[in-house]
């Protein structure tokens, strides 16, 4: 069975891992980095992903960041003269990670396990699965990020019984999960979180502070300047990271803007104390989900054996201190918070292929599921933290006499009234025979698969007529839309490969021209004029081809010059050897006996 890669598709950074033997290994990207920025940019029709996209973000307005925060919504982003869904942009990141894995493994990769925040709802999970499909990946499993982290941590500890609290604060989402490990079973007891809280929010607090301070000093609002704002974002992210290791950091942005008197520079010192003050409400927002998860699991802090920190934002000292205070435990530092999720996803891939034995993953649904009933009430069929996959049925009836149809309004959330919860979808069961209210028996069944994706069935028990839907939110893509996006993505991949080949061909041709010029200089006056002229002509033809767009012509001219250059190089080598030989003979001729009175003989030491 082919390899199943593990992908952590993050808000700010993503990572890809693969199982090698029994060990999960992070695959570095072509730049040698173990994580790849979740950044996509468009420039001159070209799609740029990762480190290269992040580097040019300041000067390129067509740069898209933190697309994960839009997954599961109908919001689109405009770039490159068209509109893209969050799934399409995410697919570009996934394609990049897929290519990284293929280059490392030396084989085609078609299957993946992709992680999502534990608190992702059905629409967000479906969008993630669609993104994988667009990228040319069969998504074997969607795994919750904290669960994947626990899997990576506990794989070599399957003989121990432990209860683990995973505190996962990433770039854009926050989750807390509590798991029980024992005999190879990873059982999620409870999960809680906030899909709108992460490292980006901490960055924004610093940006807002810098903008306010600069406006106070100079009367200019940097928030209105897109290029300045991108520089502020980069500086804020760096300052946040710096303050995890030092108590003061200097923010220096020369020529940030211009005033009436000329260019203006931004110079500010940010202390950790000030940073803690600015972000106090964000840190506090993580406290309640920790308590909620413990309460839902029916545990106290004394029952927790280990606390794992996941996500780059857990390096913030105030966050670590809050975790310490809430759990009465020193967080476990044995896992890399940026890499552990992808590693866990790769392990789950190994479980699916059978390479990892005796490991069972029991995940849960993060939010309650149900339908709207009379009076706008939310009636739950499946409670939050129910182990998945699962199925639950309940019988309802009509609310009016001779009602011919029922509308099924499917919801996800915890609030008592339907209007306050997340709508997953609506469908209708029709042709109900005329009868007084309360007589027809309508059975509603919820199914949640191992990926946390919901399907709902309504059945008239009297007529046995039924209607089933796999939930698609407003952002859900049809199979036709996904197929079209897949074709577009494949075309982009082919175009990218062609573009890379063109660049490589041009670079090799440039290098050949340079090397030929150097060789001709070294051979000046040492070879026949006809050979030099032949090389010069071939070199000029290649230079002329490089000015055009015909790649096949560049290849042909390169091959012609390469052959001539090789012959010249052989001549240069032969001449160098001949010169060395002559020099050696001259040295031998110059050497003479130093003492004609020397003689051979035996001697005996006298004692």
Curated annotation (Swiss-Prot):
Organism: Lactococcus lactis subsp. lactis (strain IL1403) (Streptococcus lactis)
HAMAP family xref list: DnaK (MF_00332)
Organism phylogeny: Bacteria, Bacillati, Bacillota, Bacilli, Lactobacillales
Keyword Transmembrane: no
Cited function: Acts as a chaperone.
Keywords, ordered alphabetically: ATP-binding, Chaperone, Nucleotide-binding, Phosphoprotein, Stress response
Resulting phenotype, residue 103 to S: In strain: LM0230
Effect recorded for residue 223 to G: In strain: LM0230
PANTHER family: HEAT SHOCK PROTEIN 70KDA
Pfam families linked to this entry: HSP70
Protein's name according to its UniProt entry: Chaperone protein DnaK
Expression triggers: By stress conditions e.g. heat shock.
GO BP terms: adhesion of symbiont to host; aggregation of unicellular organisms
GO CC annotations on file: cell surface
């Amino acid at each position: 069975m082919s390899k199943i890669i593990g992908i952590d598709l993050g808000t700010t950074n993503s990572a890809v891992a693969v199982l090698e033997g029994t060990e999960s290994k992070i695959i570095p990207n072509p730049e040698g980095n173990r994580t790849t920025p979740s950044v996509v940019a468009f420039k001159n029709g070209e799609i740029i992903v990762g480190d290269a996209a992040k580097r040019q973000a300041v000067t390129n307005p067509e740069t898209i960041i933190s697309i994960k925060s839009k997954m599961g919504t109908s919001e689109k982003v405009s770039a490159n003269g068209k509109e893209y869904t969050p799934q399409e942009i995410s697919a570009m990141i996934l394609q990049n990670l897929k290519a990284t894995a293929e280059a490392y493994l030396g084989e085609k990769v078609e299957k993946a396990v992709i992680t999502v925040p534990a608190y992702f709802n059905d629409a967000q999970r479906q969008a993630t699965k669609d993104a994988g499909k667009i990228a040319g990946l069969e998504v074997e499993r969607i795994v919750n990020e904290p669960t994947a982290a626990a899997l990576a941590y506990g794989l070599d500890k399957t003989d121990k019984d432990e209860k683990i609290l995973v505190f996962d604060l990433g770039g854009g989402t926050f989750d807390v999960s509590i798991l029980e490990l024992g005999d190879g079973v990873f059982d999620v007891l409870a999960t809680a979180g906030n899909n709108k809280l992460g490292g980006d929010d901490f960055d924004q607090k610093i940006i807002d502070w810098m903008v306010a301070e600069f406006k106070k000093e100079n009367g200019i609002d940097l928030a209105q300047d897109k290029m300045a704002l991108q520089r502020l974002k980069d500086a804020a992210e760096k300052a946040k990271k710096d303050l995890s290791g030092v108590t003061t950091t200097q923010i220096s942005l020369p020529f940030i803007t211009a005033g009436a008197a000329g260019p203006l520079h931004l110079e500010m010192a940010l202390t950790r104390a000030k940073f803690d003050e600015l972000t106090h409400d964000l840190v506090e927002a993580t406290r309640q989900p920790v308590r909620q998860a413990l309460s839902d699991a029916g545990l106290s802090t004394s029952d927790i054996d280990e606390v794992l920190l996941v996500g780059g934002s857990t390096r913030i000292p105030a966050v670590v201190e809050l975790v310490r205070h809430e759990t009465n435990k020193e967080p476990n530092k044995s896992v890399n918070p940026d890499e552990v999720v992808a590693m866990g996803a790769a392990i789950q891939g190994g479980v699916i292929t059978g390479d990892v034995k005796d490991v069972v993953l029991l995940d849960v649904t993060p939010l309650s599921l149900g339908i709207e009933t009379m009076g706008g009430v939310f009636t739950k069929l499946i409670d939050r933290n129910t182990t998945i996959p699962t199925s639950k049925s309940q019988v309802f009836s009509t609310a009016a006499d001779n009602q011919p149809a029922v509308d099924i309004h499917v919801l996800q959330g915890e609030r008592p009234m339907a209007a306050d919860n997340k709508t997953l979808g609506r469908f209708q069961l029709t042709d109900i025979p005329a009868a007084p209210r309360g007589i027809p028996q309508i059975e509603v069944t919820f199914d949640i698969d191992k990926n946390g994706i919901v399907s709902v069935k309504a059945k008239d028990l009297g007529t046995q007529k039924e209607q089933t839907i796999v939930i698609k939110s407003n952002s859900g893509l049809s199979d036709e839309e996904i197929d079209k996006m897949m074709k577009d993505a494949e075309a982009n991949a082919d175009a990218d490969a062609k573009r890379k080949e063109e660049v490589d061909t041009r670079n090799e041709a440039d290098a050949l021209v340079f090397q030929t010029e150097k060789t001709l200089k070294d051979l000046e006056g040492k070879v026949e004029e006809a050979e030099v002229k032949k090389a010069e002509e071939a070199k000029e033809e290649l230079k002329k081809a490089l000015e055009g767009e015909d790649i096949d012509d560049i290849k042909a001219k390169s091959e012609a010059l390469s052959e001539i250059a090789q012959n010249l190089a052989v001549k240069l080598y032969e001449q160098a050897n001949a010169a060395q030989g002559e020099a050696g003979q001259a040295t031998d001729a110059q050497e003479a006996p130093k003492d004609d009175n020397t003689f051979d003989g035996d001697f005996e030491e006298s004692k």
